[in-house]
């Protein structure tokens, strides 16, 4: 029923990567398959973790596929590559430094059985810095397709690391694309404008690590340029009209140019 799709690259922390894989093995119900894409050449520490978990997943009768890309291609293209090796009907996303709560797969299977018409669903997330629960900070998102469509005009309406999607639906809209920092957001827009059904479960099933200069990567003119490119893509699809684009961009022009300390305060306020 479920393939887990994950990407790892050389700058990922081996210990965090190990925690992510361990959280999958600790599930109350195991996934059927795990597909790991190595986005470029890795270091020995990461390769050692992969070797360890090749054995562990095999001993639990979970197929573990490792696909290695010769050069780093970015998250969107890495996931697109890996999706072709997922052999189950549903693809569950997982980041290489986050922690899936023990019942994530079990709850996902239950939701699939109860909602066969939903093409993509996600959950809430709880963010942490050093250990789960240390920030007491959550990101909850709209539950219904209509709410997701409306909320998506302002902010990303899904937590990418929490989603589970029908493989057929993903392929129907052209899969992931290389839309830097917006690979997931753009995918949701493509699905929404093509009348696929999205939903969110109103509980947290993933603990998300927010270190690694998360704030620093979300500021500056370079990031702002990517925001404009994303908006133009959404306009091309008919999701944003002129007013939508203006309302989306105005606060971001201001926010992306803030110093780190103020940007961090804004980020925390948005979560609260």
Positions of PLM-derived features:
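Catalytic beta-strand/loop signature of glycosyltransferases that borders the donor
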Residues: 124, 198-205
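Conserved donor NDP-sugar-binding/catalytic core segment of glycosyltransferases
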Residues: 103-135
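Glycine-rich, basic loop-to-helix element that forms the pyrophosphate-binding segment
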Residues: 68-86, 107
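Acidic donor-binding loop at a coil-to-helix junction in glycosyltransferase catalytic cores
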Residues: 180-189
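Short aromatic/hydrophobic "clamp" motif used to bind/position activated sugar donors
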Residues: 91
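Short, well-formed alpha-helical segments that are part of the catalytic scaffolds
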Residues: 11-26
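Short, flexible, basic/aromatic active-site loop/helix in glycosyltransferases
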Residues: 123-124, 138-156
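Catalytic core of nucleotide-sugar-dependent glycosyltransferases
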Residues: 208, 216-240
